[in-house]
Amino acid sequence: LGDVYKRQAYLYDMKKKTSSLLADPMKPILEKIELGKTEPWNFTASDGTVITGKMCLPPNFDPNKKYPMIVYYYGGTTPTTRGISNPYCAQLFASRDYVVYVIQPSGTIGFGQEFSARHVNAWGKRTADDIIEGTKQFCKEHPFVDEKKIGCLGASYGGFMTQYLQTQTDIFAAAVSHAGISDVTSYWGEGYWGYSYNAIAAADSYPWKDPDLFTKQGSLFNADKINTPLLLLHGTVDTNVPIGESIQLFNALKILGKTVEFVTVDGENHFISDYDKRIKWHNSIMAWFARWLQDQPEWWKEMYPERHL
């Protein structure tokens, strides 16, 4: 990636413990980029818990306009602010004229043991309540959001959350799930991380012991409740969440006549690392949201023209 991302170079003085910038080759390019305003936005949930988050506005934001909104939440219960970089960049969506709401719902680590343990043996229920309540409250307090044009996005456990949310609410007009888990049982038995992850997320619970947990919380067993246009993305060699998790939900939704598309990324694992494939993966997400949230289907149709076999 050296030819694509030209990094800053610093000289660090070990004795003085000071650093000085030697080169910043990207500065002329970055100076031309206008970023949207980002600020914290927290709300108090119905149970009294303060749920933290942030909002990111388009660079040329006009409070008198109506904007589509994208809601983003954690993957693997890792805080959305923990990583050095984030493939789901709020500023990227904001640059496309979306309001972005990033939420840290129940189950997120880094907010105390009780808070992080809320998703244990719940697999989405408490977290979904926070996301749905937070989204509704955000819209109530910000009239510039078009409530009929809200999308949601998550990956891994966040992909599971995207799928599960659509079985609980119809407030979203479009949804994107990357490497999501559709059946807790098959993930527990097949996924490279499945058994060890469930040792915490479903502590002391097993399919034969707690069948309701392993079925009722899976979107596959509730596919008939999904009405939101859903995009499934998955690397073909994902060793964390096997690609079958997306395949089986795609098949179920197709049988039910639901609106669903499935994009596979050949040769990629849980994270999309190849640069060119990552660009197409990003564009797939952006095109899907443009289709359903901005009434601009052309991008999607250009990328994935219909084929009649």
Regions inferred by a protein language model and the residue ranges of each:
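N-terminal cap/lid segment of alpha/beta-hydrolase-fold proteins
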Residues: 23-64
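Short loop/turn segments that connect beta-strands within beta-propeller blades
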Residues: 14-17
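Short, small-residue-biased leader/transition segments that mark boundaries at the very start
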Residues: 1-5
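Short beta-strand element of the alpha/beta-hydrolase
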Residues: 65-75
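Structural motif
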Residues: 6-11
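Active-site-proximal cap/loop segments of hydrolase catalytic domains
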Residues: 86, 102-309
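Short amphipathic alpha-helix adjacent to the substrate-entry channel of hydrolases
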Residues: 84-103
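Serine-hydrolase catalytic-loop signature spanning alpha/beta hydrolases and amidase-signature enzymes
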Residues: 77-79, 100
